Amino acid sequence: MMNPVLEFPVTDEILTSFALAIGPDLQGYRNHIYRVLNFYCALRGNDGLPGEALQIAAAFHDLGIWTDNTLDYLPPSVRLVTDYLDSRQRGELKDEVSALILEHHKVRSYHSAYALTVEPFRRADLIDVSLGLVRFGLPRAFIKTVQSMFPDHGFHGMLIKLSARQFIRSPLHPLPMFRW
């Protein structure tokens, strides 16, 4: 099995620019992203860094939670990444990065545009959100290694708290970020 990747420079640069918005959840969110990116690389059989589109999407994929204070965070996250790509004249990445973000909570497998990156990213996020209960064939030992290298720092607890608050506010729409 591959060795975990220890640094994702593009992701870190983006997270640094949003550190104030993310606040005390920064380390937990960063480690979530690092776990997801490592699971993505393992699922794809990548050795080394994933492409720039993936690193950018990973940094922004849940960011709307903090910038817009909502669990319905996919549209705000796409808005933020669109502004980011525009400011760097990287418009050619918009479609793929948007698909990566918008479809990462899709309940069923993803088979549309950019499926070669979107589907493993969706699976990698699910591996992390499920705390490794869902593995998509990754060895349990690899998942545990990545989890120990990049500890939770309260990330899953924060998600549970936000989900409970969302359920109380909107019991008919408790998990707005999920897609069929």
Identify the residue ranges that each predicted region occupies.
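Divalent metal-dependent phosphate-bond-processing catalytic cores, especially two-metal-ion Mg2+/Mn2+ enzymes
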Residues: 2-9, 19-47, 60, 89, ...
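Glycine-rich, flexible beta-strand/loop modules in the N-terminal catalytic cores of phosphate-handling
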Residues: 15-16
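An active-site-proximal "capping" alpha-helix that borders the catalytic cofactor pocket
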Residues: 36-40, 72-87
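His-Asp-centered metal-binding catalytic motifs of divalent-metal-dependent phosphohydrolases/nucleases
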Residues: 50-68, 77, 98-105
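Hydrophobic alpha-helical segments of small multi-pass membrane proteins
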Residues: 81, 102-103, 125-126
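Membrane-interface starts of transmembrane alpha-helices
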Residues: 90-95
